[in-house]
């Protein structure tokens, strides 16, 4: 709740204290309170110190945000490494968009970060204590046309061999509606990508108990799960179940981890991106105060899982500041 209030305060500050002397740029991110939304809102707050106002539109589906950025409809966005590959190769949700590869070529990166894991959770009274118990149940998988719902299906298929349209009822809803459905017991299981220790998950252990399902070692090489864990920006990771109060699974929990990035487009002015990049890193202490998981954002992790070229403005800052930039991220334009 404290994190939500802090994010809301930042959003209101960005909206109400608009600096008329600075140019304004549109930015899109996922729901406030999740990893991409949290860091993006903090990024926008620091950008204003560099004279760049970013109008943050939160609660968006990132598959669509990256498409909007490629078209030039927005200037900044929360990005997913795997979505960049899919867009560039006109696959999955981008398969029917003829211009998808062209839009992908317009995208540029600013910085990467470790985002979190896919939490597969169910309530104590659900009758579900193991993956096999999901059969015949209602499972919230994520939003329409999103990479998260694809990941959720892959995890469950890999562990159980269950299909979402046959062995259990896969529920596709926007993030907020899915969360409410789980809260109101309208779905039995919720798959929620979030940073480890996030308030969105912890709320279910404050007055009752809940259970996180851990990926068993026997499923790690299953094709459906392997497809997800080997995708750009993803991999199997582990954390202690005790990080959450009221969480019933003891010991280490294995989950599908994911990394993301903050991006822009090649159409945005070099000086603008230089200024927002500089403001972010020069105010890193403020970024670290925003959320626990952001303490892992350092100069050494700046390019975590980034798989598309840096914007030339960001690259200019990184060169000046002495960052070690991977060869494949150096812009050619």
Positions of predicted regions on the chain:
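Sec-dependent signal peptide recognition
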Residues: 2-9
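Sec/Tat signal peptide C-region and signal peptidase I cleavage site
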Residues: 16-22
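Bilobed "Venus flytrap"/periplasmic-binding protein-like clamshell domains
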Residues: 23-55, 116-184, 300, 304-313
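Pocket-flanking alpha-helical
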Residues: 38-46, 57-101, 176-182, 196-205, ...
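Ligand-binding pocket segment of bilobal, Venus flytrap-like solute-binding proteins
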Residues: 74-78, 167-230, 315
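A structural signal for short loop-to-beta-strand junctions that line the ligand-binding cleft
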Residues: 98-113, 243-253
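An extracytoplasmic/periplasmic, membrane-proximal ligand-sensing/linker region
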Residues: 194-214, 224-227, 259, 268-333
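C-terminal lobe and pocket-closing loops
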Residues: 213-275
